[in-house]
């Protein structure tokens, strides 16, 4: 006879599923090892992160500034095949097609909670223009809709960065859990990116 899952186990699984939205965003996003320590050590101001939900669709907007030049920021954000190195929950990120200003990037990410593991699959059509990277999922396997953009604009001696994501998960998650985790994990993702921006600029 198969034992039924306890309320704690079911809640844990919902929390695990909720973490996936940010874990896979080139974006976006991310339960990253060491991110909490980086946030403590990083004196940079906390990013402005807004999460909204409407009829099962979640919209995330994040804004932050970094001292690096836009060219450095965009070089990191568009280094698709190296994403697993600085965003470890993204297990694979492979460029399947490449044309001027357009790419197709296939990504897989894994989120774990205790003995439970969930894999997310994306096939992103990416369009690059001056200062902006837009992406949309074309496979619909893990999300019924998933699209967003990064923008990097020169500001003073650094760069103002904006991240936007609109996603509708293909799994059930309580709204209050997902909104809270999206906001927290977006902040962790940004801290990880800040570290990578600084490392690239120092080369």
Predicted regions span which residues?
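N-terminal secretory signal peptides that target proteins for export/translocation
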Residues: 1-16
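A mature extracytoplasmic/lumenal domain signature
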Residues: 77-79, 87-89, 99, 107-111, ...
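Short, hydrophobic-biased amphipathic alpha-helical segments
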Residues: 181-193
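Glycine-rich portal/gate segments that line the openings of hydrophobic small-molecule binding cavities
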Residues: 53-54, 65, 94-142, 191-203
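Hydrophobic ligand-binding cavity/cleft-lining segments
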Residues: 37-100, 188
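One face of beta-strands
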Residues: 45, 58-62, 107, 120-122, ...
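Beta-strand/loop substructures that line and gate deep hydrophobic ligand-binding cavities in soluble
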Residues: 137-184
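Bacterial N-terminal signal peptides
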Residues: 19-31
């Amino acid at each position: 006879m198969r034992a039924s899952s306890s309320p704690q186990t079911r809640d844990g699984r919902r929390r695990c599923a909720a973490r996936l939205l940010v874990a896979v965003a080139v974006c976006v996003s991310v339960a990253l090892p060491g991110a909490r320590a980086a946030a403590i050590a990083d004196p940079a101001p906390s990013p402005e992160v807004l999460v909204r939900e409407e009829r099962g669709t979640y919209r995330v907007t994040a804004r932050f500034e970094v001292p690096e030049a836009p060219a450095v920021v965009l070089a990191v954000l568009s280094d698709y095949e190296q994403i697993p190195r600085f965003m470890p929950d993204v297990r694979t990120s492979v460029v399947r097609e490449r044309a001027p200003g357009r790419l197709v990037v296939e990504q897989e990410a894994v989120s774990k909670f205790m003995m439970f593991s969930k894999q997310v699959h994306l096939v992103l059509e990416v369009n690059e223009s001056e200062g902006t990277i837009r992406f949309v999922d074309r496979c619909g396997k893990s999300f019924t809709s998933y699209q967003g953009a990064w923008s990097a604009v020169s500001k003073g001696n650094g760069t103002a960065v904006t991240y936007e994501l609109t996603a509708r998960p293909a799994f059930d998650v309580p709204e209050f859990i997902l909104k809270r985790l999206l906001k927290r994990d977006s902040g962790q993702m940004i801290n990880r990116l800040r570290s990578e921006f600084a490392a690239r600029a120092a080369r």
